[in-house]
A protein has these predicted regions:
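Feature captures the catalytic ectodomains and active-site-proximal regions of enzymes
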Residues: 1-507
Length: 507
């Protein structure tokens, strides 16, 4: 291929649905994307399971998707890495984990396990929590307390009760008691909405919340009030009108979420800095996290450190002296920067980053356009100026609005993306760019369960890939997300590094 400039457009959450009645994308008016099937070479990509480094049958997500897209290979995800470590006994013998356990044992301190209790596999997995309680039991600990964050976003909105019952039944032959229950909306914020985080902080450290006899009754009560898992207000398990356990100075805490973004804030308020305006003060804790949430955190131990990914697309472009732009709205900005760069925070030489602020609304069904038009207005002039050799652009709508499960809003989200993509592709073709139009995973393609209830999770469906070029009309074969980067380098006429083990999808 000659020296092409390329644009990767990621329509986040846009999959190929198999059930028309559940597929907001098929129900939406998408004249532009629909027209591409007849005009340009296209195929599908797998975004889930072992093809993206997850366990078989595990749905993909934005973090995994962008890592694979940028790395040009299958990137083994923390979920799979931890599953294997449990199987081989590597987790039980892990130095950071053992030092937390031994600290609690030697100093007769409580050990708290914090995290998302579900099998969503995006942020955590209930099997990891069960393994941790078993390891604590083998070590002879008896003061083990679980602070359960309920999901309802990567799992069905009312699946939390089942997960809590599954955990309770495991604890009967293991060690540990559930001390509090809080919806992830509060405990796992990532947008610096400290007023939400404060509810979780006060529950964990002061026992502030609805007093309940057990975790299951807290969830049942929430359901009775029509509150789903994600939004459950803190509930505190009490005995004799006192919380059975709160996090106190000197305790050991293990946060078992493996995805780094959504337990960063709760870790920050517990261990890193005071927020006096919210009456949140850091505690001296023996604090351990499953993975490294933030490399600037002090006195936080890490069970699994990152394997550094080298020779990602961004790094190869830097080595070739090429310029690149990464652009997204707030919700997906870390994905086109940090994750697309293989877990690297710092921009590459020649890389510019552009962000449009996501709208400040409680949930995105209230503004399904999100900031797509602003993004488009920012990137089209850059394309017209041909200011970058490569552009990575993410439209968040089909995913973020899909997560609300609101059908009409999802349709509006998809239609917004269609019109924005049309503007980008038109500008690209006028200015000599080749566009790779794809998605990182599905979501809006399956929004209704068989019983008609909303499905808010990602899907296992493949996603489309269009290669849109003024002249090129070759064959493109089906593949996986990790095949995109080498295919882009092929179009740009840049040698593909051996580390990029993905396939080139064109002949």
């Amino acid at each position: 291929m000659e020296n092409k400039k390329c644009i990767l457009v990621i329509m986040d959450g846009w999959g190929h649905g198999a059930v028309k009645d559940s597929d907001a994308i098929q129900h939406a008016q998408t004249p532009f994307v629909s027209s591409l099937y007849a005009q340009y070479p296209n195929t599908t990509l797998i975004t889930c399971g072992e093809q993206v480094g997850l366990p078989e049958g595990q749905m993909g997500n934005s973090e995994v998707g962008h890592l694979n897209l940028g790395a040009g290979r299958i990137v083994y995800q923390e979920l799979q890495r931890i599953n294997v470590a449990i199987r081989t006994g590597e987790l039980a013998n892990n130095e950071s984990l053992q030092s937390a356990i031994q600290y609690a044992k030697k100093n007769n301190k409580k050990l708290h396990l914090l995290g998302l209790v579900s099998d969503g596999g995006v942020h955590s997995h209930i099997s990891h929590l069960k393994a941790l309680t078993d390891i604590c039991q083998q070590a002879g600990l008896d003061q083990v307390f679980i602070h359960a964050f309920t999901d309802g976003r990567d799992t069905d909105p009312k699946s939390g009760l089942g997960f809590i019952q599954e955990l309770e039944s495991h604890l009967k032959q293991s060690v540990g008691r559930i001390a509090s229950v809080t919806g992830r909306y509060y405990a796992m914020d990532r947008d610096k909405r400290w007023e939400r985080v404060k509810l979780a902080y006060d529950a964990l450290t002061k026992g502030v919340g609805t007093p309940v006899a057990d975790a299951a009754s807290a969830i049942s009560a929430a359901y009775a009030d029509n509150i789903t898992d994600e939004f459950i207000k803190p509930a505190i398990i009490t005995e004799q009108e006192k919380p059975i356990a709160v996090i106190e100075e000197g305790d050991a805490v293990i946060c078992f979420n493996f995805r780094t973004d959504r337990c960063r804030e709760i870790t920050e308020v517990l261990t890193q800095q005071d927020f006096p305006e919210f009456n949140m003060h850091k505690l001296h804790l023996e604090y351990t996290t499953m993975t490294e949430y933030d490399n600037t955190f002090k006195h936080v131990h890490v069970i699994f450190r990152n394997d550094n990914l080298t020779h990602t697309l961004g790094e190869v472009l830097e080595q070739q002296g090429k310029t690149q732009i990464r652009i997204a709205e707030t919700e997906k900005y870390p994905h086109v920067t940090f994750f697309f760069s293989g877990g690297r925070e710092i921009p590459f030489e020649g890389e510019r980053r552009i962000m449009a602020a996501s709208p400040k609304v409680a949930t995105y069904d209230l503004q399904p356009e999100m900031s797509a038009h602003e993004l488009t207005d920012k990137i089209v002039p850059e394309i017209q100026a041909q200011s970058a050799d490569f552009i990575c652009l993410n439209y968040a709508n089909a995913d973020m609005v899909g997560h609300t499960g609101v059908w009409q809003a999802a349709i509006k989200a998809v239609e917004t993306v269609d019109s924005c993509v049309q503007q980008v592709v038109t500008a690209a073709l006028e200015n000599g760019y080749t566009v790779f139009l794809t998605a990182d995973h599905g979501n809006a393609d399956f929004l209704k369960n068989e019983d008609g209830s909303p499905n808010t999770a990602h899907t296992l469906n493949p996603v489309p890939l269009f290669i849109i070029d003024k002249e090129w009309r070759g064959q493109v074969k089906a593949g996986k997300l990790g095949d995109i980067a080498p295919t882009i380098l092929h179009f740009m006429g840049i040698p593909i590094p051996t580390e990029m083990t993905g396939d080139v999808l064109v002949s």
